[in-house]
Amino acid sequence: MSYRLKLTITISLLIAISFGIGGTLMITTSFNATLKQETQSALSSFESVQNMLYLLNSLGDQSDYESLADALSQMETQGLGRWQALTLKNSEEELFRSGSAELLNYSLPVPAPDQCSYLPVADDQGHGLIVRSLISAGETDLQLQARFDVSHIYEIRAAQQKQYFIVYIAVVFF
């Protein structure tokens, strides 16, 4: 093999490797930024629900949980709730549930009152974000837990990786 051919092949492979590393970093960076943005959006939506429940609880009788459940039901009916599943419980009973209870079968650390904890999950239902908080309601605490669907981000990443792989193969072989 001539020196010129070896040099051409070596430079082509270096370009392909650089292209591969650069593209992978670009997809990963884009995915992480989108996931962070979607997490912030889900947390913001959760905080809106939480603040609405605080407001209703402070305006009415703190033991009247039916008004809280009605408000959540109205939000769901009007399409204002972005959640995939949501529960509101006190220590004795479940006050409101939307969606499948299986979607919320994850143990999260119990947050301090007026704060929330969250956990990204992946299961048969796709990828999601579980968020949990405690709401002070008089002498008892209400537990609000929701799951938000983030599967579409992972689907976009898989499609980008597939397209990139095809382009990468084309660069390597041509």
Residue locations for each model-derived region?
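Juxtamembrane segments flanking the first transmembrane helix
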Residues: 1-90, 155, 162
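Membrane-proximal, non-catalytic sensory/regulatory domains of signal-transducing membrane proteins
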Residues: 100-144
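Helix-start (N-cap) segments at beta->loop->alpha junctions
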Residues: 146-166
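Selective detector of the "anchor" transmembrane alpha-helix that sits immediately C-terminal
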Residues: 166-174
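Hydrophobic beta-strand residues in large extracellular and virion-surface proteins
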Residues: 86-88, 130, 142-146, 153
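Extracellular/periplasmic ligand-sensing ectodomains of membrane signal-transduction proteins
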Residues: 82-110
